[in-house]
Structures are given as structure tokens and as C-alpha cells.
Amino acid sequence: MAAKFLPRFWRSGSQAELLDFQNNNVVAEGKLDFEHGTLKGKSGRYGDDEEDVRRGHIEDLANHSLLNKLLRRTLVDSPHNVEVLQRDPTSPLFSVKSFEELHLKNELLRGIYAMGFNRPSKIQENALPMMLADPPQNLIAQSQSGTGKTAAFVLAMLSRVDANKKYPQCICLSPTFELALQTGKVVEEMGKFCAGIEVIYALRGNRPGKGSRLEAQIVIGTPGTVLDWCFKLRLITVENISVFVLDEADVMINVQGHSDHSVRVKRSMPKSCQMLLFSATFEDSVWAFAERIVPDPNIIKLKKEELTLKNIQQFYDQCENKEQKYSALCNLYGVITIAQAIVFCQTRKIASWLSQKLSDDGHQVALLSGELPVYDRADMIQRFREGREKVLVTTNVCARGIDVEQVSIVVNFDLPVNVDGSVDFETYLHRIGRTGRFGKKGIAVSLIENFFVYMLKEIEDHFNTKITKLNSMDMDEMGKIWK
């Protein structure tokens, strides 16, 4: 008998029911609602650009991860090595080259192969022996998107579950509603041959009655709701939890309340509980958070693909104001339609204004911003990948991890800045890194208002590169950038 994985509010698993569930569970006005993957606020409350930047920055962290999960069809074949730091350096270091070496149950092996995994990814080679060890070992792991880390911790949970015990045994915390559902989808696919194992979603709106008895062995949810289920509703007996997973830690710490709720849930776990934490990045703040969650961990890092500027010609055009930048972009438009192009804006407000103005003036463009539901964003990116859209106006949601080979020019309508107004060097690198992919020549043009010219010098110094001045009003000069 196949396992039952559908939550009570999503019995049929249809997209329509999921969207209906989201639409009928609106939070109070003015609150940031990341359990539903969206920002809901009283109309007009966040009218200034600075607040728009802050909100967009936080939301992009979560949606970037979800978009990559929706868009990737295969694992990333990274050429970089895995760095392993063991809790006990004297212990032998094991890695595996096949799933058979892990001595998994046959039904789990069938599920893995049915998902299309033929061999472990680089992070799985090293992480799985640690995650499946007896006695269990704690783990902190860093990896880029698409390296198979979700499948790795799902395999660990399914391996630890006792199907004969009808109560929660594993908890997985995700920062948003949609990311939790994506993790549940992996559980469903990998565990479809495992009889008697169920999963339930601890998400806002899915509220079993007080005193209800949960029979699902795996609980996937957002921190606040899981905390309520553990202590307010007493649906979960924390002493029975054998595996605690915290996914997307770098997103979690940027969402107000999530980090504190996560720590409170973790502190209630028994000492024997295995702690697994995953993050795409590990700035100091993430490390500090990880250390509060995971005691005595093994640590695994998979180095990110290094972006290079060597194939990218960088230009800038100095403009008086937004309207002059728009005129410069229109002059560029005759050049950028030669191939596919991405135009980056700092805020959703500017992106919406720009795409509408371009459309009104007869230019064919597509808009990708945080105002679109995330599944619509995935569809838009897929259309762009397939060449059905030639020019994409977007915010930073498209700055990382979206590889489109045909993109030959990137335009920064606004330079990327941090919340404090300083240059966001990493986002600049990732933005212009959308062109010049796979060894091809790429072009990046930044449209700079007079007040922000000093930022160009900072970018040049930071990357030890040269950004050439361009006069977008000189069409002869414009044509030369392709030669």
C-alpha cells in the first residue's frame, strides 16, 4: 500500500485548491506574511522606495529558492570539491558513489531511482553517510541550489521513521508556505513505495482541532505554526522527535520571528534528536544562528560556481533623471532586441512603471517581479528560456541561478543597493553574470543618475575592472558595442 502524503487542506493536490486555500487565509492588514510566501500589507503603508527595497530584498531570498526548485529539472554537476569538517577529526571519513552503499530499505531505493537519481550528487556523497550514521550525527551543510540537499535530508527522515508508530517523529521547518509544500512533494515522491508513512503540513490555516491526535510521522511547516502545534495545541509530543531539519537558514533569519521560533522549537527537542541545518550562504549572522540550532555539528560546504567578468564588456551611461534613463534605454532597445536581454530594476514599483511605459510606447517586453505569484514567475522565466519572450524587465528575483544561454545583454536601469544604500556588489556580479554565460561574449550597460556616479568607482575598485562610458544618444557609438 502506497503512503498517503496529502494534507487535509489539499486532498486532491490540485493547483486550484492550493491557490484557493492561500486566498482564503489572509492575515491581518499591515503584517508581513511569509508563511504564504507573499507580503500582505495595508494599501499604501509601504509607499517609499526605501521600504520597497527592504521588503523586496527579504522576499527575494525566499522566492529565489522556490523559483530554483520549480525550474530545475536536473542536479547541478558542480566541478568544485566538497569541504568536510568533522566534529571528531580522528573519525574515518566515509563517502559513497552509489545509493546501494548506504544499505537502504528496498522501498526507499525504488523511490530514489523513480525520481531519476542514478547516483549521489557531490554533497550527497559526503552528507548521506553522516546523516544515516548510527548513532545519528548532527550536520550543518552549505550548498548551491540544485545540488540535491532536499533529497538528502528527506532520505534521512524517511530512513529514521518507524511506520508502525503513528505519531510525529520528524520535523522539518521551512521559511514559507510554498517551500514547505515543495519539500513535501519530495517526501511524497521518494516515499511513494513506503507503506504506512504519512506527512502533514503545519501551515497557517491547516489547524487540527485542539486535542486531535496526529498519526503522520513527518511534520513539515513554518516555525510559528510548528511552535503552536507543539505547545499551544499540544499536537506534537516533542520527546518523540528523532530528526529535526531546518531548511533555508539564510532565508529564515531574515524573516521576523522565524529565527526565534526556530530556536524555541529546537530547544524543546530531546538530546538524542538528530539536528540537520541547511543554508545556501553562510555569512556571520547565519553561522551564529546555526550554532544556536545545531550542537557539535559536522560541517559540509560545496563551493559555489565562481562567476567571472572576463567575457563581459561593461558600459555605463550617465543620466540626469529617471526619464533620461528611459530615453537611453529606448535608444538601447534597437540594439538589445538583436538577442535576448534582461533589464534590472531595484524596486517592483520602478519595474512596473518601466515595463508599462515601454509597452505604451510600442515595445514588446515581459515583466517579472514580486507582484506576480511565484508560480507565474516560474512560467514567465520558462517562456524567456524558450525564447518566447525577448526582453525581460525584472527585479533581483531573476539575478541568481537563472541560466539562459541566449542572453547577450544586461541593462541595470538601477544599480543594486543594500538596504543601507551601499552598493550591493554580489548582486551586481550576479546580475551581469546572467550574460556572458558558457564562455560567450556578454554586454552589461548601467544607466546611472548623476548622484550615483561615485558607485561606479566603487564597483571598479571592488572587482578590479573597467566600466567604459557610453553615450546612448550617439547611435553610431551604440552600434559599436557589438563589434
UniProtKB/Swiss-Prot annotation:
User: What is this enzyme's class at the first EC digit?
Assistant: hydrolase
Q: Where is the Helicase C-terminal domain?
A: 311-478
* Position of sequence motif DEAD box: 247-250
Instruction: Give me the reactions it catalyses.
Output: ATP + H2O = ADP + phosphate + H(+)
Family matches, as Gene3D superfamilies? 6.10.250.2170, P-loop containing nucleotide triphosphate hydrolases (3.40.50.300)
The answer, when asked if NADP is one of the entry's keywords, is no
Q: Name one GO molecular function term.
A: ATP binding
Q: What is its main location?
A: cytoplasm
Q: Which domain of life is it from?
A: Eukaryota
Residue positions annotated to bind ATP are 143-150
Q: Which cysteine pairs make disulfide bonds?
A: none
One GO cellular component assignment for this chain's record is: pole plasm
Per UniProt, subcellular location reads as: Cytoplasm; Nucleus
Keywords in alphabetical order, please.
Answer: ATP-binding, Cytoplasm, Helicase, Hydrolase, Nucleotide-binding, Nucleus, RNA-binding
Entry similarity comment: Belongs to the DEAD box helicase family.
Q: Please name the PANTHER family in this protein's record.
A: ATP-DEPENDENT RNA HELICASE DBP3
Please give the name of this protein.
ATP-dependent RNA helicase DDX25
The record lists the organism as Xenopus laevis
Taxonomic classification, please? Eukaryota, Metazoa, Chordata, Craniata, Vertebrata
